[in-house]
Amino acid sequence: MGLDMYLSARKYINKIDWNKLDRAGEVDYDSATFPQYNEIVQAAGLQDVQQNNEIYGANVSVNCAYWRKVNAVHNWFVNNVQKGEDDCGEYYVSQDKLLELLQTCKNALAKRDPQELMPQAGFFFGSYDIDEYYWGGIKYTVEQIERLTKLKDFDNLSFYYQSSW
């Protein structure tokens, strides 16, 4: 029990290669389907969910970062992404917001100033002390976001934050 924090990345996978679709004749969506689309749907065991040709893609979601009791970073998400609502909901995080968090963490580390990212009190949220665990959580956040920004598909990903406590 405690504050668990998750960042997931989602990507839309097209089902249809529109360049291969013969629109002059009878439309055959199966012949224009990207093979990886069917592989993804089958790997997820969802092939029976989609039963018509009106579905043109799927969203794939992967957990890409996890924090445990890094309440200062959670506080940042609550105030900057969740509009002050600390409700364990799932919230969209734009690339700009991730870059803003990255810069805030870097500033805090460079100045050794916790005023940039203040800890948040909460039931089972962990320590409020500004100690090595606090700075380790900030450093870990920098490492995770920098890793994500270096992905070739960074601009094509949608990110979502959710906490559990």
What are these regions (language model features)?
Residues 1-165:
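Acidic (Asp/Glu-rich) sequence patches and key acidic residues
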